[in-house]
Structures are given as structure tokens and as C-alpha cells.
Amino acid sequence: KIGLHYNTCSGGTPSRTHEEYYADGTIPWVKTGEIKDNIIIHTDECITEDGVKGSSAKLLPQGAVVMAMYGVNIGMLAYLDSEMTCNQACCVFSDKNEIISRHYLFHYLYSIRDYLLLIGFGAAQQNLSQDLIKKVKIVIPPTELIKKFDEQKEPLYQTIRALMMQNDKLIKQRDMLLPRLMSGKLEV
């Protein structure tokens, strides 16, 4: 079962009534809408250290695998590119025994997403829980096979990460240049 090999936790949402939890925040805070079978390099919102201390949000390690437990992106996965926090709708996996790599876990969870959605429950909307996820059986291949899988996957992961970072730079450049082009301040 997944729970034998991975600890799970979720985060929290700092109270919006405390402006100091968000103002000038530098700690990325993941929401399920940002989990899209991707690598999360940056988030829409950041929180402060006070926001972490004053809520159930936790600092999560770089490289952690995160799953959306409910909402539009239920069952979708992401890697955290740096130390981040998340809200309570996210399930974060942390390795207990280093038998199963994060790449293997990510792809295994991806491969059983339909099953997870089938067993997900909820009155108004479908949702998953940490308890349900921890009880799901996981196929564990021999260690050597997992190592070979990781050797194949890691360069692809690094390439995807580099392309995402390059894409972010291009988006920033576009957003900077487009208003200048539209206003006539910059000519082609």
C-alpha cells in the first residue's frame, strides 16, 4: 500500500483576515488549480513565515510529489521545483524508506488516476482523501528496475523543467513588450 512507503500530508490556507500572512510573502503557496501534471516552478500567490506559523500550512521539500484531492484538477499531479507550501486540498507525498522513487510514484499515481477517481467520493463533488490514497495498493518493481526507470526519467524531467523556465521568461518578455508595442512606444 502507498501508506507503507510514503507519508502523506496536506497544507492549509492562512486566514485572509490577517494581511500580514500574505503581504510581501516570499514562500510559494500551491493551490489545486496549479496542479496540472506539471512541475510547479512558481505559484500565483506567496505567503509569509507568519502565514505558515499561523495556519496548518507546512514547508514542503523541493521535488515532492503533490496530488489535487478535489476540485477541477482532482487526481492531477505535480512536482514542486523548490520548497513550497500548499493548501488543504493537496496531498503531498514524502518518502519513508527510499524504495520507491518520486518519478516512479508520480507515474504510478498517474497510471491509476481513473481508478482513484472511481473510488473518490463526495456528496456535492467527487473528492479523494489521504486515508483513501494511503490504502491504495502499489506495485513495486525490483530496485534495479526502478533505478533504470529513474535514469531514463531524470534527463526528461530536467529538460521539461528547463523548457518551462524558458517559457516563463518568454511570457514575461511578451507581457513587457506587448503594451509598449500597442502604445506605439516601441516600433517593429
Model regions and ranges:
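Non-catalytic DNA-recognition/assembly elements of restriction-modification systems
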Residues: 1-13, 24, 29, 135, ...
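Sequence-specific dsDNA recognition surfaces
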Residues: 3-20, 33-62, 86
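Extended, folded domain segments that form the structural surfaces/walls around functional sites
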Residues: 18, 80, 151
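Juxtamembrane/interface motifs at transmembrane-helix termini
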Residues: 20-21, 38, 63, 124-127, ...
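A short beta-sheet element
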Residues: 31-32, 48-110, 119-124, 129-133
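Extended hydrophobic-aromatic, low-complexity segments
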Residues: 77-78, 102-104, 116-118, 145-149, ...
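Short amphipathic alpha-helical signal-transduction/dimerization elements
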Residues: 110-113, 117, 157
